């Protein structure tokens, strides 16, 4: 009676290493026992019972927090939590159907369940629910993360076990980056997309057609078509400030990985406001959460739902974001404007908010991160000018990731140009700027792009060096900022190399001869340039003068074997990028017949034949690369136009002059 009285007015709570008997103070228990003047043996029995209660509480705290898949039985009922509108977490019912063993890979199980409540009867499983926690008897089972079928009459979902979410994302949150395939230089929009597509090439957990599967582990209850329908819940993309055409290349790549653009998310104001009404309070399981890829004057990211918060550790989604492993994406709050019902794919219309932490792991069964200050991002500043219009400035922050950063910068810059300048018709962009790198020299940008869609080329020229830098296999590189100044004009500022000649009657070693170059501008006018060419004293009897544009010079250098040996250091890589041939230059090369070599990224022209023979024998060991011709002199002339064309002159030093 005495013990039952204490039990009736109290409740035992436990936390790791702590026992709390609510409603009864220890002094009260002591006074009750001593005041009752119990015999010694009775006192021992009561103490033993209390001790057993305490030990029982201690033994169940760690294991009772999460429910193992081994405990799951068909017919169990639970409750899920998510936000259908605003920031209010609402409950929905969960009815367990069964367990699919090894469905998502070896020792990667999925729990099948029917969900109901709120708008689910008319929406089915909703894009944006990924990560919604499911509890059975107060214990966390996992995250709603997969949907079954399209045009389904019932909301049937797959639940990723919480233990697998924690297991997949447990480990160091920082490691040496994995080398990915960098985009080519020079590059195009298609080149950026191809590099991104090749680097990801996701291995989907479920087949894309019924011909690829015949059995799913449902004990014959369903045929092979089940596997084509069981997929991760689509992840809503939030895009504010973007034109649909400008965002299309990156959108196609994300859609292939299971993302879906929220209606009105591009080219409209939905999601543009990143501030939500009133304070949102601390992050909770069931709250919407965002992964921000671009913030600032543009906004681009994705949203899901928080599954679990353990201290400052956050688990969400229940399936991958893009399954890129270690990440440094900003974690943000999110706001649900409403749910758009659809027989094909219902979706939460969301916007991303303030940064509350860092997404550090993107794995097959979850994304996870840490609450606190957000990660370092790449700051992009753009100043856009055109005659007759005021100067415009744009600033946005881009997620720092070897794979995504070049693609995001390209998309943001192209979108900015297409939104504020003409998208079609003749135009010219004069681009100057720099990419600042921590602890290294800047990468300089100086190009002119003219034609019907120069914005594509301008954006690609900025993104290309980023892909090379971030994916180099020499040493890590941190991009700090990108500062750009762009002058726009609605005229095609182009020029062609029309003529080139040496204005001298005799060409002898030791003399300087004038090289004349005529450019024919887009208006039909001629522009004359003069370059003094000193002839070396030890020059061959016959020399070659190459007058060319930047792209053709790069092609010639490739044929001559000059890029065969890559730089050994990040500094060497930056020097190589700064030596990239520009399309607003006239390049002149004086070439001799005696070749040279490239050693440790340095060009050595005019080497003796004996040295070249030794180097050729050592070429297989990576000792260097031979050159077919020796460069005896190099000049470049900067112009205010995009230059194209090439002229080659053969110079004879015996007094006969030149042969075009």
Q: Whereabouts are the PLM-identified features?
A:
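Bacterial N-terminal signal peptides
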Residues: 48-57
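Alpha-helical transmembrane segments and their juxtamembrane interfaces
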Residues: 23, 54-55, 86
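Small side chains
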Residues: 5, 57-59
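N-terminal secretory signal peptides that target proteins for export/translocation
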Residues: 1-43
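Generic intrinsically disordered, low-complexity segments enriched for polar/acidic and small residues
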Residues: 37-40, 53, 63
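Alpha-helical protein-protein interaction elements
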Residues: 19, 32-35, 48, 214, ...
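Terminal presequence/propeptide segments associated with secretion/organelle targeting
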Residues: 59-660
């Amino acid at each position: 009676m005495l013990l039952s009285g204490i039990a009736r007015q109290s409740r035992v709570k436990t936390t790791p290493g702590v026992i709390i008997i609510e409603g009864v103070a220890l002094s009260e228990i002591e006074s009750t026992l001593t005041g009752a003047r119990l015999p010694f043996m009775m006192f021992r029995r009561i103490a033993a019972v209390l001790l057993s209660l305490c030990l029982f509480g201690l033994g169940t705290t760690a294991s009772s927090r999460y429910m193992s898949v081994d405990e799951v039985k068909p017919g169990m009922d639970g409750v899920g939590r998510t936000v259908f509108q605003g920031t209010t977490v609402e409950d929905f019912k969960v009815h367990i159907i069964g367990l699919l063993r090894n469905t998502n890979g070896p020792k990667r199980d999925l729990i099948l369940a029917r969900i109901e409540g709120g708008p689910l009867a008319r929406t089915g499983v909703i894009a944006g629910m990924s990560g919604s926690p499911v509890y059975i008897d107060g214990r966390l089972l996992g995250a709603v993360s997969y949907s079954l079928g399209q045009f389904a009459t019932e909301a049937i979902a797959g639940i990723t076990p919480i233990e697998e979410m924690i297991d997949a994302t447990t480990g160091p949150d920082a490691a040496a980056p994995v080398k990915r395939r960098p985009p080519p230089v020079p590059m195009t929009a298609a080149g950026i997309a191809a590099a991104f597509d090749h680097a990801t090439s996701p291995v989907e957990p479920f087949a894309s057609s019924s011909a690829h599967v015949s059995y799913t582990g449902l004990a014959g209850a369903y045929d092979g078509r089940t596997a084509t329908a069981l997929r991760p819940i689509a992840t809503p993309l939030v895009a504010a400030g973007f034109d649909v055409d400008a965002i299309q290349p990156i959108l196609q790549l994300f859609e292939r990985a299971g993302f879906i653009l929220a209606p009105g998310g591009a080219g409209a104001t939905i999601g543009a406001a990143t501030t939500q009404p009133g304070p949102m309070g601390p992050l909770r399981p069931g709250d919407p959460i965002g992964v921000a890829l671009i913030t600032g004057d543009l906004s681009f990211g994705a949203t899901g739902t928080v599954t679990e918060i353990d201290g400052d550790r956050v688990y969400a989604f229940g399936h991958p974001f893009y399954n890129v492993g270690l990440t440094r994406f900003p974690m943000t709050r999110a706001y649900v404007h409403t749910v758009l019902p659809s027989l094909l794919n219902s979706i939460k219309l969301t916007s991303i908010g303030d940064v509350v932490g860092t997404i550090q792991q993107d794995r097959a069964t979850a994304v996870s991160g840490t609450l606190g200050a957000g990660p370092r991002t790449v700051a992009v500043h753009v100043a856009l000018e055109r005659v007759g219009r005021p100067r415009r400035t744009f600033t946005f922050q881009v997620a720092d990731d070897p794979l995504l950063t070049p693609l995001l910068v390209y998309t943001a810059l192209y979108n900015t140009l297409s939104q504020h300048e003409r998208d079609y018709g003749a135009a010219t962009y004069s681009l100057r700027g720099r990419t600042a790198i921590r602890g290294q020299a800047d990468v300089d940008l100086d190009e002119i792009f003219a034609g019907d869609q120069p914005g594509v080329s301008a954006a690609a020229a900025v993104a290309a060096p980023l892909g090379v830098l971030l994916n180099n296999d020499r040493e890590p590189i941190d991009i700090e900022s990108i500062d750009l100044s762009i002058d726009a004009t609605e005229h095609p500022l182009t020029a062609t190399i029309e003529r080139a000649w040496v204005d001298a009657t005799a060409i002898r070693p030791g003399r300087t001869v004038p090289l004349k170059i005529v450019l024919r501008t887009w208006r039909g006018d001629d522009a004359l340039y003069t370059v003094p060419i000193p002839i070396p004293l030890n020059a061959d009897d016959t020399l070659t003068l190459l007058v060319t544009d930047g792209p053709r010079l790069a092609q010639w250098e490739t044929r001559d074997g000059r890029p065969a040996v890559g730089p050994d250091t990040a500094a060497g890589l930056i020097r190589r990028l700064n030596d990239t041939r520009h399309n607003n230059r006239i390049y002149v090369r004086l070439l001799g017949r005696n070749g040279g070599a490239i050693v440790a990224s340095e060009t050595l022209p005019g080497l003796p034949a004996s040295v070249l023979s030794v180097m050729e024998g050592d070429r297989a060991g990576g000792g260097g690369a031979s050159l077919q011709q020796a460069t005896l002199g190099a000049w470049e002339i900067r112009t205010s136009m995009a230059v194209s064309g090439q002229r080659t002159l053969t110079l004879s030093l015996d007094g006969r002059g030149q042969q075009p």
